[in-house]
Design a protein with these regions (language model features):
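Helix-loop-beta segment of a Rossmann-like dinucleotide-binding subdomain
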Residues: 76-77, 102-112, 140-175, 273-277, ...
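C-terminal, low-complexity/hydrophilic appendages and adjacent surface loops
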Residues: 390, 394-427
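Helical element adjacent to the flavin cofactor pocket in flavoenzyme catalytic cores
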Residues: 156-197, 201-202, 206-211, 215
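Flavin-dependent oxidoreductases
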Residues: 78, 200-293, 297-318, 323-324
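C-terminal catalytic lobe of FAD-dependent flavoproteins
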Residues: 307-394
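Glycine-rich FAD pyrophosphate-binding loop
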Residues: 44-64
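Dinucleotide-binding Rossmann-like beta1-alpha1 core, especially the glycine-rich loop
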Residues: 67-147
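N-terminal Rossmann-like FAD-binding beta1-loop-alpha1 element of flavoenzymes
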Residues: 24-51
Length: 429
């Protein structure tokens, strides 16, 4: 059966859910950046929000690093992801004004060194496509003056970017009326009864509300209703290096194949590794070594100033977290549909995307997701939380220019299409 309300003939098959709960109450699962942003935006609109976190404190997974970089990986071609990143950067930047500069964030800028010919060409395209207020091409002398350390060449400078402490942003977002944080709560099952979503740990009811937002990164796919979400984990490890008298000369974040930030609380953060194979939560010497090699490539001068040594990694401190991404690296934000009903209703659409279905999308009333922010969470989660809250609250003005790829229904359609293509290939063998 279809859980969604029937759409009118004027609406497309994927028209937004028309479901409106009688009570403005929501349950958000996961208290990292995505969950805290979703909870904050809903509370700002007058909703009562229960925020469930499985750990003893918030921001313990991918949102727990001491320094997150406001890194704008843009495209000169105006892709959906590039649009989201550019918009999200400005939104996050405004929120950070509420935190203590120097301790919780710093607008020290981000410098992307042009480390090879391909990167130099990419940066030249960006410099033509975006205003100088957002990014500025620098020659070597200018780059070294701004960075405070010696570099191999010039690069692209983002003057309003910098670093922030993700846990501090999470705390600020949820320190407001209308949000109840419940720690040590890990729902394993969702059931819908009498217009309410019930979150259970075994047979123990943890919380209930007419609206649920799944915001626990890859854990968002642990429920029966969301198991189809095409999420993947990528292990990332950061390395902490004690600041030295000479390393404090670094004045901006350097971000190439990895990043190194100016010191916070007497320590520089560098990283993060990308490991698609391992899921071990313990820091490894091999990835510490990889991070140090990355630092040496970015700036041999800074490497020496930090007294770094790729042969001495046993005593280094670090942290491991799992990034969560989607196949096209766009975040997945919006309402969830019933995967089985979707597959039945749109089997023909999977074979021929040009068809125009008449059956309205089988939405799961009141169930939403905000996940797959990868390594861009500092930039994309606050705006995504606002987009999602607007959707839930029936305010669609923000969605007129939102990238289509952010909606789970597109991921479900692509999943169905991929399955059909695989079936077609199998039938030909």
């Amino acid at each position: 059966h279809f859980a969604g309300q029937p759409a009118t003939t004027e609406k497309p098959w994927y028209a937004r859910p028309s479901h409106r709960p009688a009570q403005r109450q929501a349950l958000v699962i996961g208290a990292g950046l995505a969950g805290c942003a979703s909870a904050a935006s809903l509370a700002a609109r007058g909703w009562q929000v229960t925020l469930l976190e499985r750990h003893a404190e918030i921001a313990q997974e991918g949102s727990g690093n001491p320094q997150g970089v406001l890194y704008l990986k843009l495209s000169a071609h105006g892709t959906a992801l590039s649009q989201l990143v550019a918009s999200g950067f400005g939104y996050t930047r405004r929120l950070l004004q509420n935190l203590q500069r120097g301790r919780d964030w710093d607008a020290c800028g981000v410098l992307q060194p042009a480390y090879d010919d391909k990167e130099t060409e990419r940066q030249a395209g960006l410099a033509e496509a975006f205003p100088a207020t957002l990014l500025q091409p620098l020659d070597r002398a200018e780059a070294e003056r701004i960075a405070g350390v010696a570099l191999a060449g010039g690069g692209l400078f983002y003057p309003d970017a910098g670093w922030a402490n993700p846990p501090a942003l999470c705390r600020w977002m949820i320190e407001r009326p209308g949000i109840e944080l419940r720690r040590h709560q890990q729902p394993l099952q969702l059931r819908r009864e009498n217009e309410q979503w019930l979150a259970f740990d075994g047979e123990r009811l943890l919380a209930q509300a007419p609206v649920v937002v799944l915001a626990g990164a890859a854990e968002a796919a642990q429920f029966d209703q969301s198991a189809w979400l095409p999420l993947k984990r990528i292990r990332g490890q950061i390395t902490g290096l004690p600041a030295t008298e000479r390393s404090t000369a670094l004045q901006t974040v350097l971000c190439a194949k990895g990043y190194v930030a100016p010191p916070r609380d007497g320590q520089h953060t560098l990283g993060a590794s990308f490991n698609f194979e391992q899921t071990d939560p313990a820091p490894s010497e091999a990835e510490h070594r990889s991070n140090l090699e990355m630092l040496q490539e970015i700036s041999p001068d800074l490497y020496q100033r930090l007294q770094a040594d790729t042969g001495a990694t046993a005593k280094l401190v670090g942290r491991v977290a799992m990034r969560c991404t989607s196949p096209d690296y766009l975040p997945i934000i919006g309402p969830l549909a019933d995967a089985h009903a979707f597959a039945e209703a749109y089997a023909a659409l999977a074979k021929d995307a040009r068809q125009v279905p008449e059956t309205p999308c089988p939405w799961l009333d009141g169930l939403y997701v905000n996940t797959a922010h990868g390594s861009r969470g500092m930039i994309t989660t606050p705006l995504s939380g606002e987009l999602l809250a607007a959707w839930i609250d029936g305010d669609y003005k923000l969605h007129r220019k939102a990238p289509k790829g952010d909606k789970p229904v597109y991921a479900l359609f692509n999943l169905a299409k991929d399955s059909q293509e695989k079936a077609d290939l199998a039938s030909r063998e």
